[in-house]
Design a protein with these regions (language model features):
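Short runs within selected transmembrane alpha-helices of multi-pass transporters and secretion channels
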Residues: 1, 76-79, 148-167, 173-185, ...
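Short alpha-helical transmembrane segments in multi-pass integral membrane proteins
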Residues: 1-30, 86-151, 193-223
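Hydrophobic alpha-helical transmembrane segments in multi-pass membrane proteins
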Residues: 32-44, 48, 76, 108-121, ...
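Membrane-helix interface segments
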Residues: 56-57, 171-172, 200-201
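Small-residue-rich hydrophobic transmembrane alpha-helices
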Residues: 60-124, 155-174
Length: 223
């Protein structure tokens, strides 16, 4: 088998990790570690900003986030596939094919998520009925799901471009593209609108989603 899989020769002969390999892992992996940590804390901060509008908002966010996570599987899976397939082509040194494949996969991801978003938008009034809560929370959850469905194609594009950048090894750029952007743009928008204005939480939520259009432009240029 060593002739067919030369890379596996001596794979289990030692647990020692060469220093130069460790350095490469740390250089590439550390930004991703910080990125995920900052992204999670940003999500918590956004939720806190929305929660200022009352307990019904908290309940509606829990409902909508649960439903959103089910439907988001589509663009998450397609984004992961971009990283795998494009990363393989980049590793083989076929830049032209990698770029062509990436463009097609991004377009496919956006089209698939557009179809899923339509289903999600139409079914939005039904999902909150599954939960034992008051009518106001159900109504808010319905509109939050609708807003998320409206922006799902945008999120599909962002996710695919994010994993395209990661597959190319541009971890610093993905760090800036993802968590730095959300802390510097999305969180301040939610913070200011929730604390210094009286606008409805649905408008705040939509404004935060709309801000990601800036990332779409950046992602389009970088990819």
């Amino acid at each position: 088998h060593t002739e067919k899989n030369a890379f596996a020769k001596g794979l289990y002969s030692t647990l020692k990790v060469p220093a130069n390999l460790t350095k490469k892992i740390l250089v590439k992996g550390t930004p991703l570690l910080f990125n995920e940590t900052l992204w999670a804390s940003a999500m918590a901060m956004l939720t806190q900003c929305y929660s200022i509008r009352g307990l019904n908002v908290v309940a509606s966010l829990n409902i909508s986030n649960t439903i959103n996570n089910v439907f988001n599987i589509v663009f998450i899976a397609l984004g992961d596939s971009v990283a795998i397939i494009v990363g393989q082509l980049l590793g083989a040194g076929d830049m032209k094919k990698a770029r062509d494949t990436d463009n097609k996969m991004i377009a496919f991801s956006v089209m698939c998520c557009t179809c899923v978003a339509m289903v999600m938008f139409v079914m939005a009034p039904l999902f909150p009925m599954l939960y034992n809560t008051n009518d106001e929370a159900r109504e808010l959850a319905k509109y939050l799901i609708m807003i998320t469905a409206f922006f799902m194609p945008q999120n599909a594009f962002l996710h695919a471009t994010y994993f395209t950048l990661r597959s190319g090894g541009k971890t610093i750029i993905t760090f800036l593209f993802d968590s730095v952007f959300i802390w510097c743009v999305s969180v301040p928008i939610a913070f200011v609108l929730s604390r210094y204005t009286g606008i409805h939480v649905l408008v705040i939520y939509a404004c935060v989603q709309l801000a990601d259009l800036i990332k779409c432009v950046i992602g389009f240029v970088l990819v």
